[in-house]
């Protein structure tokens, strides 16, 4: 009997096809649906209920059992509390990275092992290789959909217990498989945005948990231009929603957020999408979570992304200084955002990543 694999079934097309591919390869396949968020249950439309129904329908079609588990407490403690604390500091976190690290490749993995799994699998667009108890992470065939940026914080030991069945396929191929199989998820839209917010407006959602502190919007020259609703609602490079268009004798170019001064609660803006204040030559990041043995090879020249779907940018990582690293880029980078992640690559391999702490102009 081939190994037992438990697939994280989200109710989407990617995990549906992942389960089918594993079954075709002869694995003993079971599904598991994770509920990670309780807040939506009072709504008329609950996405979690629809996703569970779709996951169950797919498992019925594939004739595999579906387990369910509630990780809402773990999610709140390990992901959402961090998400809120970062926004309270005026930073812009990425909860998907932490959700993968703490929930999908930790809580889910441990739960699956108690159910007798040899491996877990997910519908992520990524690839890995396994050497003993260590897994190495590589980009998916579909570069447009590659999700290694969100997986860089997963432990190498967890990657050694993981299979990524769809990593060698493109999204159109996955949809075509699902359509040919008649899976109920074949035409389901990809989920977008932060999983626990769903269709809510982001501002409305944050207001439920954090007290907003309005303050001044100023030009880079120090001129007061208006009022902001709270620094947490704005991110570097943002253009929409500033409410200061068409001001006194200014050029017609739009305004962009270029800085946030937490101490004075001031939002700084400048005109023009190419304004120098939007660009940084480098950044300071926290400790690097390494997925490959490069820790003792610093300084290191490699490539990096400071946001999802950015093309790889040439950079140099310095040796650690006080548990931080300086990363300098070959060309200036636009709208690098503290609280987000920088993820490092060498060709197709994901080397690891770190939290962006400061920008270096």
Swiss-Prot record:
Places the protein is found: Cytoplasm
EC code: 2.8.1.13
Region (Interaction with tRNA): 145-147, 307-308
GO cellular component: cytoplasm
Residues reported to bind ATP: 8-15, 34, 123
Active site positions, chain numbering: 99, 195
CDD domains: MnmA_TRMU-like
Positions of the record's site feature: Interaction with tRNA: 124, 340
GO terms (BP aspect): tRNA wobble position uridine thiolation
Disulphide-bonded residues: 99-195
Gene Ontology MF: a single term: tRNA-uridine 2-sulfurtransferase activity
Keywords per UniProt: ATP-binding, Cytoplasm, Disulfide bond, Nucleotide-binding, RNA-binding, Transferase, tRNA processing, tRNA-binding
Region annotation (Interaction with target base in tRNA) ranges: 94-96
Chief localisation class: cytoplasm
Protein purpose: Catalyzes the 2-thiolation of uridine at the wobble position (U34) of tRNA, leading to the formation of s(2)U34.
PANTHER family reported in the protein's UniProt record: MITOCHONDRIAL TRNA-SPECIFIC 2-THIOURIDYLASE 1, TRNA 5-METHYLAMINOMETHYL-2-THIOURIDYLATE -METHYLTRANSFERASE
Protein name according to UniProt: tRNA-specific 2-thiouridylase MnmA
Organism, scientific name: Legionella pneumophila subsp. pneumophila (strain Philadelphia 1 / ATCC 33152 / DSM 7513)
């Amino acid at each position: 009997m081939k190994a037992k694999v438990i697939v994280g079934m989200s109710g989407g097309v990617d995990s549906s096809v992942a389960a089918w591919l594993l079954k075709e390869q002869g694995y003993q396949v079971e599904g598991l649906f994770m509920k990670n968020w309780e807040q939506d249950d009072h709504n008329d439309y609950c996405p979690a209920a629809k996703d569970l129904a779709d996951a169950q329908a797919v498992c019925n079609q594939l004739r595999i059992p579906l387990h369910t588990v509630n990780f809402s407490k773990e999610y709140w403690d390990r992901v959402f509390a961090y998400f809120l604390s970062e926004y309270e500091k005026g930073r812009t976190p990425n909860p998907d990275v932490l959700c993968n690290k703490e929930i999908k490749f930790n809580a889910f993995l441990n739960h699956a092992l108690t159910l007798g799994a040899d491996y877990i699998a997910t519908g992520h667009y990524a690839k890995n290789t396994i050497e003993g108890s260590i897994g190495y992470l590589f980009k998916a065939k579909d570069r447009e959909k590659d999700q290694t940026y969100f997986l860089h914080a997963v432990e190498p030991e967890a990657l050694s217990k993981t299979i990524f069945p769809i990593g060698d396929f493109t999204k159109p191929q996955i949809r075509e498989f699902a359509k040919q199989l008649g899976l109920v998820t074949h035409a389901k839209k990809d989920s977008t945005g932060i999983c626990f917010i769903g269709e809510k407006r982001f501002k409305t959602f944050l207001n439920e948990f954090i007290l907003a502190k309005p303050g001044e919007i100023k030009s880079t020259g120090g001129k007061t231009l208006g009022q902001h609703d709270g620094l947490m609602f704005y991110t570097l490079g943002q253009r929409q929603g500033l409410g200061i268009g068409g001001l006194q004798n200014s050029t017609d170019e739009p305004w962009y957020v270029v800085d946030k001064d937490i101490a004075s609660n001031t939002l700084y803006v400048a005109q023009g999408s190419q304004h120098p204040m939007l660009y940084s030559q480098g950044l300071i990041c926290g400790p690097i979570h390494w997925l490959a043995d490069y820790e003792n090879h610093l300084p290191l020249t490699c490539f990096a992304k400071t946001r999802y779907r950015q093309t790889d940018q040439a950079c140099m990582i310095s040796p650690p200084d006080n548990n931080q690293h300086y990363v300098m880029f070959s060309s200036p980078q636009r709208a690098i955002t503290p609280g987000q992640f920088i993820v490092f690559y060498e060709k197709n391999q994901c080397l690891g990543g770190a939290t962006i702490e400061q920008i270096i102009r």
